[in-house]
Each structure stands twice: as structure tokens, then as C-alpha cells.
Amino acid sequence: KHSLPDLPYDYGALEPHINAQIMQLHHSKHHAAYVNNLNVTEEKYQEALAKGDVTAQIALQPALKFNGGGHINHSIFWTNLSPNGGGEPKGELLEAIKRDFGSFEKFKEKLTAASVGVQGSGWGWLGFNKERGQLQIAACPNQDPLQGTTGLIPLLGIDVWEHAYYLQYKNVRPDYLKAIWNVINWENVTERYMACKK
């Protein structure tokens, strides 16, 4: 059974950039719902497998993708944020960003633009293309998980579902995106980058 991971900081730790009310609802209600629904879906899937019921297996796949993706995405998202975040990455990750995007500022602009441009709900991502050995920006709709749908390894995810910002930023997604850069945990993103380069 999947379980809701603990946050590595308090709900109010990312204020003023993301307020405690948003963090509490986002983690304890939204992420928890993905986890619960994923467990229920996997149980039904096991039953369908045991019966050899392929039609039922296919019917369950959208729920598996949505709730499984929601669990994967949020588990990455919480660790990508930190009350001691912000600034720029250092070392190899910064070098790779400069190599693949020209500069850190250009990278920030591109990831912000991709995230602002998500229609409806979804995610903006910095991913690693293992085949090319390059960093890549991508946007995914809904809860589509980056690696499962594009093959890119997720390094940094920005949640642009309205539940991630509406209580504080209303419908002004660009203001939320401007603020989130102040709490990006570059140590975590760097760890992910170093791990996928091995």
C-alpha cells in the first residue's frame, strides 16, 4: 500500500511565498486523495489481473495514471521545495543549465513560460534526457507523470493546478510562479541530477 509521505518542513515554513493554508490542504487533502484512490485502483487492478479480465484492466488505466501520477508528482514536489531554498544551483547542475539553456535567467524564463502556458491543470518540469545527456523543459497535463509519459527523468516539478496557489494568488498564476523560485530546493534538484547521471 502506498502512503502519504511526511513533509520535510512545517505547513507554514514556505511563507510568505506559499501560505500554510494552501500547504495543509494541498498535502493533507489533495495528495492524500491521490494516495487513497491509487490504493483502491491497484486493488481493483489486482482483482482484474487475477480474473484475467483485460477489459476491466484497460478501464482502470486512466485512474491508475491520474492517481499514480498525482502521488509520484507530489512526492517529488514537496522535496523540490524548502524554506531555505531560492537563489541559484551550484556546481555541475548550474553548468548543465548554462550549457543547455544559455544562462540560469534564460532557464528560469523558459520553465516559467512553460508552466504559465499549461492549459487548465498540469505541471511544468525540468527533466533529464538520458539518451541525449541533456536537460529539457516539458509541460504535462493533469497529473501525467513526466517519466511515464515522456521518458524524461524528473528533476524539478512546478505544480500549476489551481489548488497549488488559488487561496493566495487567486487566478494570477504568473505571481505564484514568480514567488515559487524563492523556495526551490536546489540541493534536492542537484541530488536528482547527479543520481540520474550515474
Swiss-Prot record:
The modification N6-succinyllysine is found at residues 44, 51, 98, 106. GO terms for molecular function: manganese ion binding; superoxide dismutase activity. It is found in: Mitochondrion matrix. PROSITE patterns: SOD_MN (PS00088). Binds 1 Mn(2+) ion per subunit. Its EC number is 1.15.1.1. GO terms for biological process: cellular response to oxidative stress; regulation of transcription by RNA polymerase II. Nitrated under oxidative stress. Nitration coupled with oxidation inhibits the catalytic activity. Acetylation at Lys-98 decreases enzymatic activity. Deacetylated by SIRT3 upon exposure to ionizing radiations or after long fasting. Its cofactor is Mn(2+). SUPFAM superfamilies: Fe,Mn superoxide dismutase (SOD), C-terminal domain (SSF54719), Fe,Mn superoxide dismutase (SOD), N-terminal domain (SSF46609). The keyword Ubl conjugation applies. The modification 3'-nitrotyrosine is found at residue 34. It catalyses: 2 superoxide + 2 H(+) = H2O2 + O2. The modification N6-acetyllysine is found at residues 44, 51, 90, 98, 106, 178. It holds the Pfam family Sod_Fe_N. GO terms for cellular component: mitochondrial matrix; mitochondrion. Keywords: Acetylation, Manganese, Metal-binding, Mitochondrion, Nitration, Oxidoreductase, Ubl conjugation. Mn(2+) binds at residues 26, 74, 159, 163. Belongs to the iron/manganese superoxide dismutase family. Destroys superoxide anion radicals which are normally produced within the cells and which are toxic to biological systems. Homotetramer. This is Superoxide dismutase [Mn], mitochondrial. It comes from Macaca mulatta (Rhesus macaque).
